[in-house]
């Protein structure tokens, strides 16, 4: 994977975190927000590992991890994510 692809992936994850974790005015104190993770690599068929560093209890994952707190996926420039033969628009997690 080249440097541009790595930078693009990092920026996508960073932006997904910022957008997905932005607090809303009706959020209760102590509630965990439920972000989605979008991937937009600069090249099609880019293999990406996305790990989740979360100390709470995971109650929902779409799709389920295929490694220890990690999604190993293939992503395309259009944002489509392929995971074990299925196509997704994003990765989702929910914790409590």
UniProtKB/Swiss-Prot annotation:
Keywords: Signal. The keyword Signal applies. It comes from the Bacteria. Residues 1-28 form the signal peptide. This is Uncharacterized protein in bglA 3'region. It comes from Butyrivibrio fibrisolvens. The lineage of its organism: Bacteria, Bacillati, Bacillota, Clostridia, Lachnospirales.
